Amino acid sequence: MKCFAQIVVLLLVIAFSHGAVITGVCDRDAQCGSGTCCAASAFSRNIRFCVPLGNNGEECHPASHKVPYNGKRLSSLCPCNTGLTCSKSGEKSQCS
């Protein structure tokens, strides 16, 4: 049982270490793969995940920074994929 507790503590330390990227959790775009950005969680701006860039017809944020962005994104939406723009469509914006 003591060994199990030590393993759990070790995994928690690794998961919350600065710069650790586990299961898509990130801090900056550079930690994500091609075609993705490091977007804020819709539930907490302190948690960010690697999210795919927007495709045609998908929701976007018109003021989103280009990829790669060196700062921390505040939006839960990535910018549109190459060749697409984020345009207002009704009350929401979409990649087109």
Curated annotation (Swiss-Prot):
One of its GO terms (molecular function) is toxin activity. It comes from the Eukaryota. It holds the Pfam family Prokineticin. Gene3D superfamilies: Lipase, subunit A. Residues 1-19 form the signal peptide. Expressed by the skin glands. GO terms for biological process: endothelial cell proliferation. One of its GO terms (cellular component) is extracellular region. The keyword Secreted applies. Disulfide bonds join 26-38, 32-50, 37-78, 60-86, 80-95. It is found in: Secreted. The keyword Disulfide bond applies. Keywords: Disulfide bond, G-protein coupled receptor impairing toxin, Secreted, Signal, Toxin. Its main location: secreted. Belongs to the AVIT (prokineticin) family. Potent agonist for both PKR1/PROKR1 and PKR2/PROKR2, and inducer of a potent and long-lasting hyperalgesia. Also potentiates capsaicin-induced TRPV1 current, when tested on DRG neurons. At subnanomolar concentrations, this protein both induces potent chemotaxis of macrophages and stimulates LPS-induced production of the pro-inflammatory cytokines IL-1 and IL-12. In vivo, potently stimulates the contraction of the guinea-pig gastrointestinal (GI) smooth muscle (nanomolar concentration). This is Prokineticin Bm8-d.
